[in-house]
Every structure is written in structure tokens, then in C-alpha cells.
Amino acid sequence: MVLVTGATGILGRVLVLELLKKGKKVRAAKRKSSNIEEVKKSWLFYTADAERLFEQIEWVDVDLWDLDSLRAALDGVEEVYHASAKVSFHPKDAQEMLRTNVEGTKNMLYIAEEKQVKKFLFVSSIAVLDEVNENGIIDENSQFNPKEEHSGYAQSKYLAEMEVWRSSAEGMNTIIINPGVIIGTGNWGNSSGELFTTFEKNSFTFSGGTAYVDVRDVAK
């Protein structure tokens, strides 16, 4: 059994789909307020077999601060894909991001260790990587530089990574990935999908650049 957190998010929903296509049994964690029908609708952009695959999902409501809720969600689970996160670059959301991204991850790891999960994959972000290589590119060897200024989101993801590294040092099999801005189909009004409508309505240019990645590439 595989548990995917943030299963209704831009990455989580496609990750669930890819795992099901590989024949995995998937338990998908969501909030009580999540709209799973919207997830199924978005799958129509990715597969012609959306209805059949969607019926195979075991949905479970999870509260990252309720340890009993996490124990129930992780019961019988061998692999965890922790894609749940609060994403914001507004200062007012800094404390909420610390609570969700750091404390929530810490709780997930605690119960995963208790349940002897065999693999824990944490979805971090390119936002925590600062140092570039000799070609001026951020790569797998790039590190977080605490002397540089960072957004509250980047700080929360870095601190969450430290919790994952702690679990790794204690013997858990962990993986951290750091994707760029994830772009997906079928979520035009949410998450990074808003970029398309924003650029369409307000044509402008800006200096510099950033890293974008197709959600299907991240999920695979």
C-alpha cells in the first residue's frame, strides 16, 4: 500500500494517477473540504481511463496534527509520498506555513517511523536551493545558503527537509525532490494554473528567469 498526501493538489493528483497506472494500491490523503470530483475531472486531460482508475483510490481524511488520524492513514502502508504543503509568498502566511510544512512533516515522519514505513519521499522545492555550479545552474549539488534572504515558504521547506534528514540519520529510507514551478493541466484557477490566466489577461515581461516543470515529469 502507498500513501500519497496532498492527493488533491496539482502534483498529488497526478502522482496518484501514475501509481495506479503502475498497478500500485493507493491510499490518498485529503482534507474533509477537498473536492475529489474536481480531481477526477482533471484526470480527463491525462488519461482515457480516468473513471476506472479513479474508482481504485482509497480516500482517507487526514489531519496532520492528529496523530491518531495519521496512524490510521499509515496502517499497512509501505511507501509514503508526502506532497502536502502550504504554498504562499505572502508574509501573513509565514506562521501557517511553518505549522503545515514543518510540523506537519515532522508528525508524518514520527508516525512513519512508528509504522516502520519502508520509503518516505518528501516533495520539497527548488526554492531552498541557492548555490549554482560553474555554469551558473542550480543542480543536485546546490545547497541552502542561510546567509541569503529567503521567502517564508523557502524557509519552511528547508526546515522540513532538516526533519527528513534527521529521520534518514536515524535509519529511515528517505528521498527528497526539489522540483521547480510545477505546471499542470486542468487546474486553471488554482495553484500555478493561475499563471496562465494571469499572463493572458496582463501581458508583461520581467527580468531573470525561473525553472518550470511539467507535473507529469515530476510524478514519474
Please give the residue ranges for each predicted region.
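Substrate-positioning beta->alpha
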Residues: 159, 190-191, 206-220
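Glycine/proline-rich active-site loop of Rossmann-fold NAD(P)-dependent oxidoreductases
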Residues: 170-171, 184-195
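NAD(P)H-binding glycine-rich loop region in Rossmannoid oxidoreductase-like domains
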Residues: 44-45, 50-100
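Conserved Rossmann-fold NAD(P)-dependent oxidoreductase catalytic core, especially the SDR/UDP-sugar
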Residues: 25, 94-95, 99-152
